[in-house]
Amino acid sequence: QGFYSQAEMREFIAYAAEEVGLDGSDDIAADYSAAGVDVIAVLQQDMTGYNGSVEDLALISDYTHPDLTAFLGELLDTYQPDLLWTTTTCGYACSDHAPWTSRGYRAAFSFESRFGDYNPEIHSIDDTVATLGGSAAHAAKFARLAVAFLVETTLDGSGLFSDGFETG
């Protein structure tokens, strides 16, 4: 017995042109919406390498779907119980989750820190791996969250996802 139906598809999408107005994600979300593509959930991960807060990561709570954000919290509590996490707000449509949310898709966004504590070298000449302490350890926490998200959203009624999230 497999974890997923072949009728369902999982996609990993990398966007271009975020910094000039979310153009890449907006184009893809618009195309999916126009084609009536049934998307059960979108997980956005942006800026995952810098640990600027006491907490290990933050879940963005504005311009996101509240139930999906709560689901990410459940995943963190279940699969990374020693991890400290919090919620935070951007105050605007700050990343590629926003075009999905604005079209009625459920999107959630995990971020490297509280919003005001992100990498101070962002978009500068000093925005290098050295700023991250030469390690991807912080980003690995997000990779584990993404794997938990992928697995739990493919389970058929036997995981956290069986609590009714998939039906709204």
Regions found by a protein language model. Give the residues of each.
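Aromatic-residue hotspot detector
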Residues: 12-15, 100, 165
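Extracellular carbohydrate-recognition regions
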Residues: 158-168
